[in-house]
Amino acid sequence: MQLANKQLLDPSNQLSDQRNKRRRLRFILQIAISAALGGFLFGYDTAVINGAVGEIGTAFTVSKETLGFAVASALLGSALGAFTAGWLSDRIGRRNSMLVAALMFLAGAIGSALAPTITTLIIWPVVGGLAVGFASVLAPAYLAEISPASMRGQLGSLQQLAIVIGIFLALLFDYVIVLFTSDQNPVSVIGPLAAWRWMFMSEIIPAALYAVLVTGIPESPRYLVQKGLTQRAKAVIEKTLNELADQVIARIQSSLVNTHQGKLSELFDRPHHPAADHLDRRDAGDLPAVSGPI
């Protein structure tokens, strides 16, 4: 007991603990910034097309209806991406899923910038939209699983901040590109491409950076425990959480046992409950009074 107290009061031990805390904090912030870059691309991808809407219609000579569908096509991909992100991350991991999202952001940006027809300009934003849907689900889930409880709220809000910054910088870059044209017209050419195409091309840099940074972050401990990779999970926990790794792993295992995997069909199932039946009958009896003359 006395030995333990001496170790706690030892200045060298306290200094070592402080260094470990600072090192752990820096590592967590690096992880959080890397993951939140997906939120930045979320905002950037959804906003960057705003500066090119009119010019796309002029370049491809399409109707307003077709142009509107081209602009909204990314939302279709976003819905599908958000719907499938959980399924994908449970199979290939959170980090690998974010890498897939980064590559989709990259492909969507290049494809949209070089699209030769309005049809391809509808298809490629769907690819980018898939990445938006992935990012909207994966980054918050990953940050929640890998960050300490004391920082979870702060790091979670980082995703929202990144989205807003992405929207702002996308619109700012659209404006800057227009200023670079001789007549301040987005249809004008800058180098080999029309100005509006550079607006899409500008997303390549943050998308490539996202792909690089994601490869350097650890996998979620929850996913590793779920796949039976407890030693790898323990190594990640020791780097990120100021808790005993074995206790954290035990909690994760317990939560995995008690977790119910929902199915799409459950949205349409009506659970049977006697109390609900009683309320239904009572409400049905009151219905004539409610629906009578007012």
Which role does the model predict for each range below?
Residues 2-294:
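Transmembrane-helix signature of 12-pass secondary carriers
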